[in-house]
């Protein structure tokens, strides 16, 4: 179920925030098990809160999980939800696309998040319709964080909860980018290009 918020914005400037949980990081051996979305305007105001879907995976897939996600998903309760889920990969992708059709234009909105390139690799392989719906560009908050760590080593980064659940991770990514925007980026009214 999605939640809609009203703000003044241009639909072609919207950002699709995505976070995925995977059974590991090797896209050739592992798979998606959770995906959540939020659509914001260009000012990072929430336009709509999308679905947060746990995707069922069979025993043989879960038996092949990498150690870190196996341990983490047992601790945070995601493992039980994966086993109990009735969503197939196709069901999840279709629900995500249906949500995005209401709140973004195909091919216009970039996807955003922390280490979003990794999510994008899995999306490209397992949810190709979603990959095609989003603009080819990505907004990777972890890239900005890496630059801030190097250029402003004394900067106090926002604390994260690290629940390793997709929706929580998106909310933290949006808050993190808002923090960098307010405290690191210089406000300008003129373009230097």
UniProtKB/Swiss-Prot annotation:
Gene3D superfamilies associated with the record: Ribonuclease H-like superfamily/Ribonuclease H
This protein's UniProt keywords: Exonuclease, Hydrolase, Nuclease
SUPFAM superfamilies in the cross-refs: Ribonuclease H-like
Residue ranges constituting the Exonuclease domain according to the UniProt record: 15-177
Gene Ontology molecular-function annotations: 3'-5'-RNA exonuclease activity; nucleic acid binding
Signal peptide region: none
Keyword Transmembrane among record annotations: no
One Pfam match: RNase_T
Key word Nuclease present: yes
Catalytic-site annotation from UniProt: 136
InterPro entries cross-referenced by the UniProt entry: Exonuclease_RNaseT/DNA_pol3, Oligoribonuclease, RNaseH-like_sf, RNaseH_sf
EC code(s) of this entry: 3.1.15.-
SMART domains with a match to the protein in the record: EXOIII
Disulfide links within the chain: none
The protein's enzyme class: hydrolase
Function statement: 3'-to-5' exoribonuclease specific for small oligoribonucleotides.
Family label: Belongs to the oligoribonuclease family.
Protein's name in the database: Probable oligoribonuclease
Organism: Caenorhabditis elegans
């Amino acid at each position: 179920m999605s939640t809609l918020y009203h703000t003044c914005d241009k639909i072609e400037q919207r950002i699709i925030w995505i976070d995925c949980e995977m059974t590991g990081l090797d896209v050739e051996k592992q798979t998606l098990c959770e995906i959540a979305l939020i659509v914001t305007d260009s000012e990072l105001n929430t336009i709509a809160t999308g679905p947060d879907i746990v995707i069922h995976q069979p025993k043989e897939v879960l038996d092949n999980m990498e150690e870190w996600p196996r341990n983490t998903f047992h601790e945070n309760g995601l493992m039980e939800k994966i086993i109990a889920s009735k969503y197939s990969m196709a069901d999840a992708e279709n629900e995500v696309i249906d949500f995005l059709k209401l709140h973004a234009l195909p091919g216009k909105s970039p996807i955003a998040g922390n280490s979003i390139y990794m999510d994008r690799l899995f999306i490209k392989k397992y949810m190709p319709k979603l990959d095609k719906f989003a603009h080819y560009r990505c907004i990777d908050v972890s890239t900005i964080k890496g630059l801030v760590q190097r250029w402003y080593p004394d900067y106090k980064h926002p604390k994260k909860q690290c629940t390793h659940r997709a929706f929580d991770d998106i909310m933290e990514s949006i808050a993190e980018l808002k923090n960098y925007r307010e405290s690191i980026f210089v406000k300008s009214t003129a373009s230097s290009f």
